[in-house]
Structures are given as structure tokens and as C-alpha cells.
């Protein structure tokens, strides 16, 4: 259900596009550096959006680096590393795990089960690191599955379960940055009045909720012929 949040490349300046690519490639490199090469396949454009949004409240400015990677061994690519990048990578791996779990349960796919064996230890580590996040995702996935099984005829009710997942993801991202002391805005900063942690957490949650509803509806439109 992910992969819908993409850039409009024609509307970006060259510098802006380079920053976006830096986040996208930075997440990929971050996953590979911390978890190995195979999990990098979980990367999606949505992760770059999440990282850029969260990084916008970080204290440290972007610091692009030029590095090689497995996919681009000859020409160096722009990479950006920060706490938001690491968090976005962690979230993509968690969502990939739950997608594999659903595939293995509903469709009995050998690929899903085999990949889960390879990702199981990573999932366990992430679950220890983000217990509340995992609990929230699991509860709402169960709610969504129950609604789909009951053939719920309310699109808003069904969409809300997925929207809640995105809300939790965005809120946990802000909490993670504060816990890592990545957000420290000086008293004279013009955004100081909006720098209250609870305000940022609630605002990020609203962004995530509305984005989640849009993603759910767009995905439903894409699959409408298959589901009718």
C-alpha cells in the first residue's frame, strides 16, 4: 500500500532534487550499514518523505556527503545521514515485516515465509527499540483485517485504521528525535512558539493521519477492478 508519495521532479530545483536523492539514498545506505544488504529492498519513496519531514524539525542542517554504494559502485551519489533517516529506514523494515506476515498468512507465499526467516532477527531488535510503535501498528492492522473480513461498507471506517498507523508512525518519529536530543531550538528562533514537543507530536500525527487516508483511498482506486 506504500509507494504513492513521490516527488514532482519537474517542479524541483536542481539543488532540491539533489537533497531529495540524498535522503532517499541515505536511507538505503543507512539500512545496509546497520542491517545488511537484503533489507535495503524494503525502501520506498514514502520513506524519503517521512525522513525529510522529520528532519525539518531537527537542529542540525543537512550535511550531504558523496559516497559509493553497492548499487552505484562507480559514480558517487549524494547521501544524507541523520536521526530522521535512520528512523525512516527502521519504519520501512517494520512495515515490510508486517506485509510479509500478511502475505504468508493469506496467500501462503513461499517467498514471504523465506524472507521472514531472514528478517526475523531484525524485526525482534526493532520491536525492542520501538515497542509502542509496533503495538500500535499491530492493533490497527488487526482492526483493518477484521473490517475487511466483515466486508465493511464504510470507506471512512476502513481508511481510519490505516490512517491511525500512519499517525502513530509520524508521532513516534517526533518523539524519537526529542529523545535523541536532536531538536533544540534557540529561544530567539522565530519557530520557538511552535517548538513545544506535544504541539509537534500532535501536528505530525495529523499530517500522518490525513496522508494515510489519502494513501488508503488511492490504493483502493488502483485495485477497484480486482476487488469488485
Residue ranges and their predicted role:
Residues 1-206, 217-228:
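Acidic catalytic motifs of isoprenoid enzymes
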Residues 207-212:
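Membrane-embedded alpha-helical segments that form the functional core of polytopic membrane enzymes
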